[in-house]
Amino acid sequence: MKKTTWFAGRFPGYVSPLSSVALSVLAALCPLTSRGESYFNPAFLSADTASVADLSRFEKGNHQPPGIYRVDIWRNDEFVATQDIRFEAGAVGTGDKSGGLMPCFTPEWIKRLGVNTAAFPVSDKGVDTTCIHLPEKIPGAEVAFDFASMRLNISLPQASLLNSARGYIPPEEWDEGIPAALINYSFTGSRGTDSDSYFLSLLSGLNYGPWRLRNNGAWNYSKGDGYHSQRWNNIGTWVQRAIIPLKSELVMGDSNTGNDVFDSVGFRGARLYSSDNMYPDSLQGYAPTVRGIARTAAKLTIRQNGYVIYQSYVSPGAFAITDLNPTSSSGDLEVTVDEKDGSQQRYTVPYSTVPLLQREGRVKYDLVAGDFRSGNSQQSSPFFFQGTVIAGLPAGLTAYGGTQLADRYRAVVVGAGRNLGDWGAVSVDVTHARSQLADDSTHQGQSLRFLYAKSLNNYGTNFQLLGYRYSTRGFYTLDDVAYRSMEGYDYEYDSDGRRHKVPVAQSYHNLRYSKKGRFQVNISQNLGDYGSLYLSGSQQNYWNTADTNTWYQLGYASGWQGISYSLSWSWSESVGSSGADRILAFNMSVPFSVLTGRRYARDTILDRTYATFNANRNRDGDNSWQTGVGGTLLEGRNLSYSVTQGRSSSNGYSGSASASWQATYGTLGVGYNYDRDQHDYNWQLSGGVVGHADGITFSQPLGDTNVLIKAPGAKGVRIENQTGVKTDWRGYAVMPYATVYRYNRVALDTNTMDNHTDVENNVSSVVPTEGALVRAAFDTRIGVRAIITARLGGRPLPFGAIVRETASGITSMVGDDGQIYLSGLPLKGELFIQWGEGKNARCIAPYALAEDSLKQAITIASATCIRPAS
């Protein structure tokens, strides 16, 4: 006797939801495990067994119908991709835990999974390669298809894989992107009592295949009583592409050298270097953070090699800049904080990587040839060559070296690093250089560098970077040799706050004071529930003078029941300055939900509104304080605001108000500041423009690598985990700041779709190469959502019959009483319905919906099914 088993199924392809009645029936018919043979008793579903479709395909326990399913593919517990995979019916065999469905893989897909096809051939002559069963080709391989969650788990023995590093993504999955034109812009300005100033930054480019053409420029304008000045700076133009077989990048034009072995310098020429980004996350990673303390609402400017690479307005108190463009984060960063009262802080943040350790067997190289390039008007452009190599050796050792060659300069460096286990990691190197300076004097000397990094996990201490460099009296760098004179200033002109245009020294050099010792430190200490401490700083001293360039910042931060507070102290001094700048600052932020006693409210306007207080004291004994209110508004938290009022013992009362809106087509910020002597307005407008084969799309500020989202007709749909990003009126959007050579999840928020928009699958994944604009396309259906009751000869169609709209290909299934739920349906068309084999088990149901169906959430209609002529 056959054992009756209940049924729950899902048809292959993209099956639209059923009517509520049909869904409740299907949800109840859950499969039960049984040793006996199973079959479906149609009499249970209807007394008239002829009114039930042929359900024999579900009589194999938990077997599902073969076809194409969109599944999440996991290999050895690592996510690979979300893709359409074809499944065929087959007997359950060794390694097959998919319930009778056999996933079909092509040789290309098997390579994508990282299988070593040379050791494990997967295709034979004369054998169908469109459906390869992994367990049959690879001993120990297993596949398991979880139909309920649409997850395909693949287990492969490590011996069968080309690369066992965690996070490895085969180059076959890397996407070079689509042809495109890109513009990234940022426009900031201020209008005050005495002067106006504007700053426009433009990064434009073209993408074609693997090639990226970029130009970076900036325009400065200032105007005061009786003067005005403007200047356009061409910061750089370059062409770049990936050399995938070499895991390298080629750059031609204006760029910077690496800073692994030598200090970074600008050049105009060509560079070929190993790309860390092409390797898994476990093999690389470090980025600089610029910290400081602003006493007032200040303008923050960061320069590198004489060029302005970052400019923004910061609130009083401690700040940390973590979003510098990675392509501009090599070499020392010159930080300028222009305070509201006219005072200025200047200090240098050195940037050096952690010790240069490489895995055993890995070789990293960097070759550069070109003219030295700097934004400093005091320097020339000598031609030079630079080559470095870093090699991972056994026993945790790394050896490295390199050379710099120019007409008036020769340098060679050798060094080694080692992993000390529980003691951290260390590297030591020595550089010998022979230099001819601007006065034609010849010098030679050595420089010894020591770097150390260590995380004391048991104590919460992290020595992110601890370094020291000692140089003999005759040691000079390529940057020193490029100066045209032995000493001098590089000037820019600005307002002195009293309606006069005055020169402002941006940098000073004196080659008679060669660098001697340089110490840098970056330490953090986690105190658990009691907060954290950090110490960052550097000190550079020189031969023949007691002056130093020194900057230190010590800070403590903690929180309690939603309240956050911090105390920080900074000390800075530059060569030629009148004295050291010292600032002590305290900051506190309290959510309104705490002030009102609703401490644990979740995502309400009270949680998003903060009362703030900050106070600071400088070296002159000037005390100042500010209180304010700030927070975020709108559903997506993309409108932020701040209002403050304060007082200074030297400058009286002051205040500010600012707001920033992160919109779909860009970011807009406005602000107002005043004090006893002046007031000013400032604003910032930034965004991106992308031209592609389907038109032009406006966006928020672009990153180096971006994703173009294509969902035709799906307007106003939000992108998950992207503040303020949603599709435009055509269904296009740009997701900025994609991670290169990594899986990027792109998901449409289906809750923001209108009643007539559906998407086959709202999630896609892409793996872009450096600088690419990759397309994430979604198959959208724009049309009517309808429940159509179809009848044949006056009787409902059989339950479980397959339905397909002939023009659009939309599929569904007949539910209870002949009801069919369909979405994305054209106003007029035909439904092809089949419930068994033979011409008598199919029919065609023409339908026509009213125009006002487009205004309804769901339309109810009926149709008569007609058997096709033989």
UniProtKB/Swiss-Prot annotation:
GO biological process: pilus assembly
Membrane-related topology note: Multi-pass membrane protein
Name of protein: Outer membrane usher protein FimD
Function: Involved in the export and assembly of FimA fimbrial subunits across the outer membrane.
UniProt KW keywords: Cell outer membrane, Disulfide bond, Fimbrium biogenesis, Membrane, Signal, Transmembrane, Transmembrane beta strand, Transport
Source organism, top-level taxon: Bacteria
Localisation per UniProt entry: Cell outer membrane
UniProt key word Disulfide bond: yes
Single GO MF descriptor: fimbrial usher porin activity
S-S pairs: C843-C865
Main location: membrane
Family per record: Belongs to the fimbrial export usher family.
Record's GO cellular component terms: cell outer membrane
